[in-house]
Regions:
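C-terminal boundary and immediately downstream tail of ABC-type ATPase nucleotide-binding domains
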Residues: 221, 225-245
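ABC family nucleotide-binding domain
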Residues: 3-224
Length: 245
């Protein structure tokens, strides 16, 4: 039986009078790789930002191992440290080296000693192929390399779940493959991942489940085979038809 990590119940989010998420329900089990697809403005990124508490939901519940992390008195900082996020724009510290970027959070948030944090950072920088660049600063490396560092930084925090917010959309086309390759390796290693993406081949080939969002709601979800080969709703078919040659 799969181990339930996250359960989202009736989640809604409004900015002023504009509701961007409406009554969202879904679950995340250990080892799940869930791709969230949909047109721009459908609420995908806002959903991830709510899960990471970068945005506060207007209503609903986010249960982490059965505990509602939106309830007053819950240690949200501890929760955030267990749910990592990789951003479209990398969000690296430009005044730090690659290695320092991957060490800083471990020391400040997890209270690791620098030697342990350094060794842990190197483990993941080697895994993403960035060990030769540990003394470089973000301005000295390519976009694809920055995103690989961002993934290593997130993994060095030992998250239980990793959220990816369109991790390849800011990259030049020739750099997309190197980042997707790292993400495939993570998925195959058993990392629990939620990925907002426009990379349909990745969603189809790597995901355990695909969620299609439109207008702030989950319109349809299922296995990649179900969603890509036999979508049940016309709006899902219309969206996917844009990606078929």
């Amino acid at each position: 039986m799969d181990a339930l990590i996250l359960q989202v119940n009736h989640l809604s989010k409004s900015f002023g009078t504009h509701e961007v998420l409406t009554d969202i329900d879904f679950t995340v089990d250990k080892g799940d790789v869930i791709s969230i697809i949909g047109a721009s403005g459908s609420g995908k990124s806002t959903l991830l930002r709510c899960l990471n508490l970068l945005e506060t939901p207007t209503s609903g519940e986010i249960l982490y191992h059965g505990e509602n992390i939106l309830r007053r008195g819950v240690n949200q900082a501890k929760y955030r440290s267990r749910v990592g996020m990789v951003f479209q724009s990398f969000n690296l510290f430009n005044n730090m080296t690659v290695l320092e970027n991957c060490v800083s959070g471990q020391v400040k948030v997890l209270k690791r000693d620098k030697e342990t944090a350094h060794a842990h950072a190197m483990e993941y920088l080697e895994r993403v192929g960035m060990a030769p660049y540990i003394n470089a600063r973000p301005r000295q490396i390519s976009g694809g390399q920055k995103q690989r560092v961002a993934i290593a930084r997130a993994m060095a925090m030992d998250p239980e779940v990793l959220l990816f917010d369109e991790p390849t959309s800011a990259l030049d086309p020739e750099m997309v493959g190197e980042v997707l390759s790292v993400m495939r390796d993570l998925a195959q290693s058993g990392m629990t991942m939620l990925v907002v993406t426009h990379e349909m081949a990745f969603a189809r080939d790597v995901s355990r489940r695909v969620v299609y969002m439109n207008g702030g709601v989950i319109c349809e979800q299922g296995t990649p085979e179900q969603l890509f080969s036999d979508p049940q709703k016309q709006e899902t078919r219309d969206f996917l038809s844009r990606f078929r040659g």
